[in-house]
Each structure stands twice: as structure tokens, then as C-alpha cells.
């Protein structure tokens, strides 16, 4: 395997023309089936070294059995989130991460790296966190893996982004709705195959409010009315529009099904899985005053109670994959 990277050379091909050959001294081969595997080994080494140098400098949590948990990194390929419960700890974690990456010749993109404080105030704290001497920009929201994460832990901005994305892709194929030779079945397939996945990307993790659910359903009705060729001046009821299109389940109901699918998946995990342990754990510290924000489990509770069962009963059902799948697909009276 090592021989693949000794005296490696490459060129750039554009059409039928090729550039001069040049030496490749860093990085992995583009398109090689081994590259993802090799990168995982490499980044795992970085993570382990940083963790060893920053013990006890993550976000403290208490597990279901009372054990101490420290969460200091979220990883997906080369997208990394470093976490700490104080500015001093975050400085240390980021500093050590930068040193380890530099020693292993992995470049940290300072321009794309941001700092964010998570609290109810959702305001900037003027943090001074640096990588290789360069100060990182502080923001009150940022996009991670396609979703918007905000400092106050609200989901509204992410939902609005998905609504905007759904309307954008719907508008891109809007001319197709006027094609008379395209049947409603074909239009419905396009809507469900393009618009719905865009609007509900990442919805499994949402804890939505009534307002957020209304945004999704309003966007959907705009799309369905356009597919039918009717507008509000025609005074056609939403129920009739849905009957014509052949879609009875609302977008918010589809979102509930995705949330329940993910809930069942987590409940079936082994108790020693990190995801399950974090799911069962509680963050250290006291709750701040005021009305608590809509939590993810609140959405789960709402969805299962609409189907006529309690959360405790739903937890029992989740362990049988086939039974849970049928339960998730069950149409409530609101969606029937």
C-alpha cells in the first residue's frame, strides 16, 4: 500500500489535453477506493491524540447510570466540531487540535472555522479563540452537515431554510406543472421525489413548534395548489386540493414519521453505544429561568400520542422493528 504513494505523480486533464506531470507529496489519491479508508485511519489518529491531551475539557454530562461523560468532538469525515463548557477550555482544545493537525501536515481552514456560544441569550460573547495565531470569527449560527445550528438552540432558522429550499426546487420545475401531457400521478411523483426530501432534510432531529409546523404545511399547500392550477381567489378548500393531487398526509405529518423512525432506531441501539448513552444522559448544571424550549422528545411525545399511545408504550413497541414500522406508517385522523 505504501508503494502507491512513493514518488506519486499526477496531471490535470481537460478534454483531450493534459497538463505537465507534477509530483504529489501530500494528500490522498482522488478517486481511489482506499482513500476514504486511509483518511479515516488518519483522522482517527488525530482525534485520539487530541482527546488524550485535553482530558476533562469537553461538555460534562451525567449518564443514565450516573457515570460521567465528556463530549468534546463531533466528527463527520473532515467536518469537525470542538466543544467545551468554558472559554478557557475551548481555547485549550482548539490550540491542541491545531498543533496536532499542524504536526501531521493537516491544514485547518481558519476562514471556514467559526466559534459559537450556546446559551438562551443567543448573543456574541467576544471570545478570543485562535488557531496558529489567527483569531476565529464568532457567530450566532452556522451550517453543519446541511443544517443550521443556532446559539439559542432554536430550530426555527433551520426549518425556514428547508422551507426556502423546498420552494426553490419547486420553482425550478414549476414549468412542468403546466404541461398538459404530464398526468397528476407524474406531478405527484416529482413533488414527492424532489420537493419533499429537500424540505424535510434532517427533520429526524427537529423539535418543532406549532409555528414551525405551520410553515411547512403552508409551503406544501402553495406547491399543491400550483400543481392543480388553482389559487386562493378560486376559493377551493385545502381538502379538495389534496383530493385532486392525491396527497392526504401533510408535510408536518411526514416530519413526525421521520422523527419516530429515528426514535425507534435509537431505542433499539445497544446501551453501550455512544449515541444511546448521550441520548439518555443529562447535561450538567441547572436549567435557566423561563419557559423551556421545545425539545426533541416533546415532538416524539406529540407524535405517539396522536397515534393513541403513551411514550412508555411506544418505547416497548420500538423494540419490534416490524411492529414499529407499522406504527410509524399509521395515519392519524388529522392526516387521513
Predicted region positions:
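C-terminal anion-handling pockets and recognition modules
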Residues: 316
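Eukaryote-specific, cytoplasm-facing alpha-helical/coiled-coil scaffolding segments in long proteins
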Residues: 222, 290, 326-329
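C-terminal helix/juxtamembrane-tail motif
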Residues: 322-336
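Nucleotidyl polymerases of mobile genetic elements and RNA viruses
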Residues: 1-250, 254-257, 273, 280, ...
